Amino acid sequence: ENCGQRSVPASMLVNRGIGLTCVCVLRRFGCPPQFLSVLRAFHDGMTARVSFGGELSDPFEVLVGVKQGCVLAPVIFNLFLVAVTLFFRSNIQTSDGVPFNFRLDGNLFNLRRLQAKTKTSLDNIFDLQYADDAALPSHTPQGLQRGLAGLDDAYQRAGLSINTKKTVIMTTPVGTDPSTHPVITVQGHPLEAVKQFTYLGTVITSDLDLSIEIQNRIRQASAAFGRLTQRVFNNHSLSTSTKVAVYKAICVSTMLYGSEAWTPYQRHIKTLEQYHIRCLQRILGLRWWHRIPHVEIRKRANIQSAEVLMLQRQLRWVGHVIRMPSDRLPHRLLYGELVHGERGVGRPFKRFSDHIKATLRRCDISPASLEFLASDRDAWNLACKEGLARLAAQTERVAQERKARRTAAASSAPSGPSCPHCGRVCASDFGLRSHLRKHR
């Protein structure tokens, strides 16, 4: 899917918080005059002091922004960003976004439903915004430049400015050289072209590969594990169950952050499982030379494999998206496909829907009953819990069978031609001839 992604953090350099701009925005959203008067009274003449080293500085007047820690600050800022988004979308063209077709009736895995000419609907993605972090997707450099200019104009009208040092541009498809990227500017400043950038803690790459994101997640989890090692994991006063509970709440959550939207391959799952087992070995006080199987390690710690923990999050997220109202963007994207772009010749990238379908089959859940089960939250959670338990049992059974085959192969009597001089058994005639040179 050919699209340009950009990360646009807004810098709160000139936020005129409770100035005329904010008052106009709140009045536009229907706030009564009495509320606006009280709100301005809270902030007019506001002073602050800085605490450092147990001492307080002299009071100074605060002319911009809202009070730190005020319960109204998040609401005011959200309304502020809504006003910015509405103004931004009113000044861009429809073709500047990323169009996609969607159809909400039928089963998720029935791709033929999107081939209908009259039952599909069209929607556009213009921006993906979370607080003051925004990503602008576009299919053309011209549309991206117009969208960025419109967003910059909207921010300036609201008293904000785009931080050009933290704003980058990334182009797909795979193999696109950043040096050939079109020049996109903000207020005359060209933006840096990169092959990857971090958005909301997740590393997004131009080739859509999860390898870098997996390594980043493991680094973050390792840092969290290291900070807790002396206080928790090496603390002999704590029980193993307590240590595993802390590990699962902090380290596993960090390792699998954002995994709800992953489309992993087996190599990614293997990397996660290796790190997962290493952490459990350190918690249980085991070393590699103890030669304890992974199944036994997880059983002692009373925790599931990294794959099962990841699939649990993904199935829970899919059920949540399916239950969303029909006007929500995640719900439409799950049941849609991009208008532009083609899947290449040969084996294409695995889609998220393909991964979910394969997971349901491994859990003995019929893909055709996805919408029916997910519509009831309790029934869906129960089906996922039972299905993942069957998946974990099947995985454990396969691992034990492989171990039994390896043990049987190692203990079986060797067969093959033997050396007439020393009696050594060789694997083949060629090996025997090579060995006979030793007795010449």
Map each language-model feature to its residues:
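Short linear motifs embedded in intrinsically disordered, charge-biased segments
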Residues: 31-35, 50-440
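Conserved catalytic palm subdomain of right-hand nucleotidyl-transferase polymerases, strongest
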Residues: 1-27, 71, 136
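Exposed beta-strand and adjacent loop surfaces of beta-rich binding modules
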Residues: 47
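Low-complexity intrinsically disordered segments
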Residues: 7-9, 15-18, 44, 182, ...
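Short, well-structured alpha-helical segments
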Residues: 36-43
